[in-house]
Amino acid sequence: MGDSVKRRGGNAVILIFAEWGAGMVNSTGMSIFAGNKYRPSMKQADDSRAALCLQFLRDIAVHNNREWFHEHREEYDAARAAFESMVAELIARITVFDPAVQYLGVGDCTYRFYRDTRFSPDKSPYKRHFGAYINAKGKKAFQGGYYFHLEPENCMLAGGSYCLPSDVLRAVRQSVCEQPEEFHAIVGSDPFHTLFPVIGETHVKTVPKGFPKDFPYPEYIRCKDYSCFHPVPESFFTSADWLERSAEVFQVMKPFLDFVNAAIDEAV
Protein backbone atom coordinates (compact mmCIF):
# COMPACT_ATOMS: atom_id res chain seq x y z
CA MET A 1 0.00 0.00 0.00
CA GLY A 2 1.29 3.33 -0.87
CA ASP A 3 2.45 6.39 0.97
CA SER A 4 -0.34 8.76 -0.03
CA VAL A 5 -3.87 8.76 1.31
CA LYS A 6 -7.10 9.69 -0.29
CA ARG A 7 -9.46 8.40 2.43
CA ARG A 8 -7.52 5.21 1.83
CA GLY A 9 -3.94 5.11 0.76
CA GLY A 10 -1.67 4.19 -2.10
CA ASN A 11 -1.43 0.49 -2.97
CA ALA A 12 -2.99 0.02 0.35
CA VAL A 13 -5.98 0.94 2.28
CA ILE A 14 -7.02 2.88 5.84
CA LEU A 15 -8.33 4.20 9.91
CA ILE A 16 -9.46 6.19 13.29
CA PHE A 17 -10.93 8.81 15.64
CA ALA A 18 -11.38 8.99 19.45
CA GLU A 19 -12.10 11.49 22.19
CA TRP A 20 -10.05 11.47 25.40
CA GLY A 21 -9.71 13.64 28.46
CA ALA A 22 -7.07 14.85 30.86
CA GLY A 23 -6.89 11.52 32.67
CA MET A 24 -5.61 9.46 29.72
CA VAL A 25 -2.04 8.18 29.65
CA ASN A 26 0.21 6.98 26.87
CA SER A 27 2.12 3.72 26.44
CA THR A 28 5.18 5.07 28.24
CA GLY A 29 3.17 5.95 31.34
CA MET A 30 2.97 9.66 30.56
CA SER A 31 -0.27 11.42 31.37
CA ILE A 32 -1.85 13.87 28.95
CA PHE A 33 -3.23 17.07 30.47
CA ALA A 34 -4.79 20.27 29.14
CA GLY A 35 -2.66 22.08 26.62
CA ASN A 36 -1.03 18.84 25.43
CA LYS A 37 1.39 18.78 28.38
CA TYR A 38 2.82 15.45 29.53
CA ARG A 39 3.35 14.44 33.15
CA PRO A 40 4.33 11.11 34.71
CA SER A 41 1.49 8.79 35.66
CA MET A 42 1.39 5.64 37.76
CA LYS A 43 -1.47 4.11 35.76
CA GLN A 44 -1.93 3.26 32.10
CA ALA A 45 -5.36 3.04 30.49
CA ASP A 46 -6.06 0.24 28.00
CA ASP A 47 -6.93 2.63 25.18
CA SER A 48 -4.26 5.26 25.81
CA ARG A 49 -2.11 4.59 22.75
CA ALA A 50 -4.82 5.07 20.13
CA ALA A 51 -6.20 8.05 22.03
CA LEU A 52 -2.77 9.66 22.13
CA CYS A 53 -2.27 9.11 18.40
CA LEU A 54 -5.66 10.49 17.49
CA GLN A 55 -5.32 13.58 19.63
CA PHE A 56 -2.03 14.42 17.96
CA LEU A 57 -3.57 13.83 14.53
CA ARG A 58 -6.45 16.14 15.35
CA ASP A 59 -3.93 18.76 16.43
CA ILE A 60 -1.76 18.45 13.32
CA ALA A 61 -4.84 18.72 11.10
CA VAL A 62 -5.44 22.17 12.57
CA HIS A 63 -1.79 23.23 12.81
CA ASN A 64 -0.24 21.64 9.76
CA ASN A 65 2.92 23.73 9.55
CA ARG A 66 6.58 23.21 10.39
CA GLU A 67 6.74 25.79 13.16
CA TRP A 68 3.96 24.16 15.18
CA PHE A 69 5.33 20.68 14.51
CA HIS A 70 8.79 21.56 15.79
CA GLU A 71 7.32 23.20 18.89
CA HIS A 72 5.33 20.02 19.57
CA ARG A 73 7.89 17.45 18.51
CA GLU A 74 7.60 15.73 21.88
CA GLU A 75 3.92 15.04 21.24
CA TYR A 76 4.69 13.62 17.80
CA ASP A 77 7.44 11.37 19.14
CA ALA A 78 5.13 10.03 21.86
CA ALA A 79 2.28 9.44 19.40
CA ARG A 80 4.59 7.78 16.89
CA ALA A 81 6.02 5.48 19.55
CA ALA A 82 2.51 4.56 20.68
CA PHE A 83 1.44 3.78 17.12
CA GLU A 84 4.53 1.70 16.40
CA SER A 85 3.98 -0.36 19.53
CA MET A 86 0.45 -1.12 18.30
CA VAL A 87 1.83 -2.14 14.90
CA ALA A 88 4.37 -4.48 16.52
CA GLU A 89 1.61 -6.21 18.48
CA LEU A 90 -0.56 -6.50 15.38
CA ILE A 91 2.25 -8.09 13.34
CA ALA A 92 2.76 -10.66 16.10
CA ARG A 93 -0.95 -11.43 16.24
CA ILE A 94 -1.31 -11.80 12.46
CA THR A 95 1.68 -14.18 12.48
CA VAL A 96 -0.50 -16.69 14.34
CA PHE A 97 -2.59 -17.33 11.20
CA ASP A 98 -0.23 -15.94 8.53
CA PRO A 99 3.35 -16.96 9.41
CA ALA A 100 4.67 -15.26 6.26
CA VAL A 101 4.65 -11.89 8.06
CA GLN A 102 6.68 -13.08 11.06
CA TYR A 103 9.96 -11.59 9.84
CA LEU A 104 8.57 -8.11 9.28
CA GLY A 105 9.70 -5.30 11.52
CA VAL A 106 7.69 -2.18 12.27
CA GLY A 107 9.85 -0.19 9.86
CA ASP A 108 8.93 -2.59 7.05
CA CYS A 109 5.27 -1.69 7.49
CA THR A 110 5.11 2.02 8.33
CA TYR A 111 5.56 5.25 6.38
CA ARG A 112 7.18 8.64 6.74
CA PHE A 113 4.97 11.28 8.34
CA TYR A 114 6.18 13.91 5.90
CA ARG A 115 4.15 14.43 2.73
CA ASP A 116 5.61 14.59 -0.77
CA THR A 117 4.10 17.89 -1.90
CA ARG A 118 5.97 18.27 -5.19
CA PHE A 119 3.01 17.45 -7.40
CA SER A 120 0.16 18.29 -5.03
CA PRO A 121 -1.79 21.56 -4.79
CA ASP A 122 -1.99 20.86 -1.03
CA LYS A 123 1.36 21.99 0.36
CA SER A 124 0.67 20.90 3.94
CA PRO A 125 3.95 19.31 5.03
CA TYR A 126 2.54 16.56 7.26
CA LYS A 127 0.08 13.74 6.93
CA ARG A 128 -3.10 13.59 8.98
CA HIS A 129 -2.97 9.87 9.64
CA PHE A 130 -0.80 7.00 10.79
CA GLY A 131 -0.91 3.91 8.59
CA ALA A 132 0.76 0.51 8.55
CA TYR A 133 0.74 -1.98 5.68
CA ILE A 134 1.63 -5.47 6.88
CA ASN A 135 2.66 -7.31 3.72
CA ALA A 136 5.11 -10.20 3.64
CA LYS A 137 6.19 -9.11 0.14
CA GLY A 138 6.85 -5.53 1.19
CA LYS A 139 5.01 -2.21 1.14
CA LYS A 140 5.54 -1.66 -2.59
CA ALA A 141 4.61 -5.16 -3.76
CA PHE A 142 1.70 -5.80 -6.08
CA GLN A 143 0.60 -8.62 -3.80
CA GLY A 144 -1.94 -7.68 -1.18
CA GLY A 145 -1.50 -7.35 2.57
CA TYR A 146 -3.21 -6.10 5.72
CA TYR A 147 -3.69 -2.37 6.29
CA PHE A 148 -4.18 -0.62 9.65
CA HIS A 149 -5.05 3.09 9.57
CA LEU A 150 -5.54 5.66 12.32
CA GLU A 151 -7.13 8.91 11.25
CA PRO A 152 -9.75 11.11 12.93
CA GLU A 153 -13.19 10.41 11.45
CA ASN A 154 -11.81 7.89 8.96
CA CYS A 155 -11.51 4.60 10.78
CA MET A 156 -11.02 1.25 9.07
CA LEU A 157 -9.18 -2.00 8.66
CA ALA A 158 -8.49 -2.86 5.06
CA GLY A 159 -6.38 -4.91 2.71
CA GLY A 160 -5.83 -6.24 -0.76
CA SER A 161 -4.09 -5.07 -3.91
CA TYR A 162 -4.45 -1.52 -5.13
CA CYS A 163 -3.25 0.36 -8.24
CA LEU A 164 -2.35 -2.79 -10.16
CA PRO A 165 -0.72 -2.54 -13.62
CA SER A 166 -3.11 -3.51 -16.41
CA ASP A 167 -1.46 -6.87 -17.11
CA VAL A 168 -1.48 -7.87 -13.43
CA LEU A 169 -5.08 -6.71 -13.02
CA ARG A 170 -6.05 -8.78 -16.04
CA ALA A 171 -4.34 -11.82 -14.54
CA VAL A 172 -6.38 -11.50 -11.34
CA ARG A 173 -9.59 -11.08 -13.33
CA GLN A 174 -8.69 -14.12 -15.40
CA SER A 175 -8.13 -16.18 -12.27
CA VAL A 176 -11.54 -15.13 -10.95
CA CYS A 177 -13.09 -16.00 -14.31
CA GLU A 178 -11.49 -19.46 -14.32
CA GLN A 179 -12.43 -20.22 -10.70
CA PRO A 180 -15.68 -18.33 -10.15
CA GLU A 181 -17.19 -20.64 -7.56
CA GLU A 182 -14.02 -20.77 -5.48
CA PHE A 183 -13.77 -16.97 -5.43
CA HIS A 184 -17.48 -16.58 -4.72
CA ALA A 185 -17.24 -19.05 -1.84
CA ILE A 186 -14.66 -16.75 -0.27
CA VAL A 187 -16.13 -13.29 -0.81
CA GLY A 188 -19.76 -14.42 -0.69
CA SER A 189 -19.42 -16.21 2.64
CA ASP A 190 -21.35 -14.69 5.53
CA PRO A 191 -18.28 -13.75 7.63
CA PHE A 192 -16.51 -12.07 4.71
CA HIS A 193 -19.53 -10.34 3.21
CA THR A 194 -20.58 -8.99 6.60
CA LEU A 195 -17.20 -7.33 7.11
CA PHE A 196 -16.50 -6.45 3.46
CA PRO A 197 -19.76 -6.05 1.52
CA VAL A 198 -18.02 -4.57 -1.55
CA ILE A 199 -14.90 -5.83 -3.34
CA GLY A 200 -12.78 -3.10 -4.89
CA GLU A 201 -12.89 0.65 -4.45
CA THR A 202 -13.44 1.45 -8.13
CA HIS A 203 -15.07 -0.50 -10.95
CA VAL A 204 -15.56 -0.32 -14.70
CA LYS A 205 -19.17 0.01 -15.84
CA THR A 206 -19.34 -3.14 -17.93
CA VAL A 207 -17.58 -6.50 -18.16
CA PRO A 208 -14.05 -5.81 -19.45
CA LYS A 209 -13.15 -6.63 -23.03
CA GLY A 210 -12.02 -10.21 -23.48
CA PHE A 211 -14.15 -11.62 -20.67
CA PRO A 212 -17.49 -13.42 -21.12
CA LYS A 213 -20.48 -11.10 -21.02
CA ASP A 214 -22.53 -13.83 -19.38
CA PHE A 215 -20.10 -14.37 -16.51
CA PRO A 216 -22.24 -15.28 -13.47
CA TYR A 217 -20.54 -12.77 -11.15
CA PRO A 218 -19.77 -9.73 -13.32
CA GLU A 219 -19.14 -7.52 -10.29
CA TYR A 220 -16.05 -9.60 -9.49
CA ILE A 221 -14.32 -8.89 -12.81
CA ARG A 222 -15.43 -5.27 -13.08
CA CYS A 223 -13.08 -4.41 -10.21
CA LYS A 224 -10.25 -2.01 -11.01
CA ASP A 225 -8.55 -3.09 -7.79
CA TYR A 226 -8.89 -6.10 -5.53
CA SER A 227 -9.15 -4.49 -2.13
CA CYS A 228 -11.64 -4.54 0.71
CA PHE A 229 -12.44 -2.07 3.48
CA HIS A 230 -13.98 -2.41 6.91
CA PRO A 231 -14.86 0.94 8.55
CA VAL A 232 -14.98 0.85 12.34
CA PRO A 233 -16.29 3.26 14.97
CA GLU A 234 -13.88 5.40 16.95
CA SER A 235 -14.31 3.17 19.99
CA PHE A 236 -12.87 0.16 18.15
CA PHE A 237 -9.22 1.07 18.61
CA THR A 238 -9.63 2.57 22.05
CA SER A 239 -11.15 -0.64 23.41
CA ALA A 240 -9.11 -3.12 25.42
CA ASP A 241 -9.75 -5.90 22.88
CA TRP A 242 -8.88 -3.97 19.70
CA LEU A 243 -5.98 -6.32 18.93
CA GLU A 244 -8.04 -9.50 19.09
CA ARG A 245 -10.87 -7.94 17.09
CA SER A 246 -8.48 -6.62 14.44
CA ALA A 247 -6.88 -10.05 14.10
CA GLU A 248 -10.31 -11.62 13.66
CA VAL A 249 -11.10 -9.21 10.81
CA PHE A 250 -7.79 -9.88 9.09
CA GLN A 251 -8.15 -13.64 9.50
CA VAL A 252 -11.46 -13.49 7.64
CA MET A 253 -9.69 -11.48 4.94
CA LYS A 254 -6.81 -13.94 4.49
CA PRO A 255 -8.46 -16.41 2.03
CA PHE A 256 -9.28 -13.44 -0.23
CA LEU A 257 -5.66 -12.28 -0.10
CA ASP A 258 -4.44 -15.82 -0.76
CA PHE A 259 -6.58 -16.09 -3.89
CA VAL A 260 -5.59 -12.70 -5.28
CA ASN A 261 -1.92 -13.13 -4.41
CA ALA A 262 -1.74 -16.54 -6.09
CA ALA A 263 -2.88 -14.92 -9.34
CA ILE A 264 -0.41 -12.06 -8.92
CA ASP A 265 2.45 -14.45 -8.15
CA GLU A 266 1.91 -16.13 -11.52
CA ALA A 267 1.76 -12.81 -13.35
CA VAL A 268 4.89 -11.11 -12.00
Regions found by a protein language model. Give the residues of each.
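Hydrophobic/aromatic-rich structural module bridging two neighboring secondary-structure elements via a short loop
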Residues: 95-141
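Long, solvent-exposed, polar/charged low-complexity segments
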Residues: 43-59, 66, 87-90, 181, ...
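Active-site acidic/histidine clusters and adjacent loop/turn architecture
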Residues: 53, 58-111
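Short, structured patches in soluble enzyme cores that scaffold and shape functional sites
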Residues: 136, 161, 230-232
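Extreme N-terminal basic, low-complexity initiation segments
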Residues: 1-12
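Compact, glycine/acidic-enriched structural inserts
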Residues: 152-203
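Short, positively charged and aromatic/hydrophobic N-terminal segments
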Residues: 14-16, 23-26, 32, 37-38
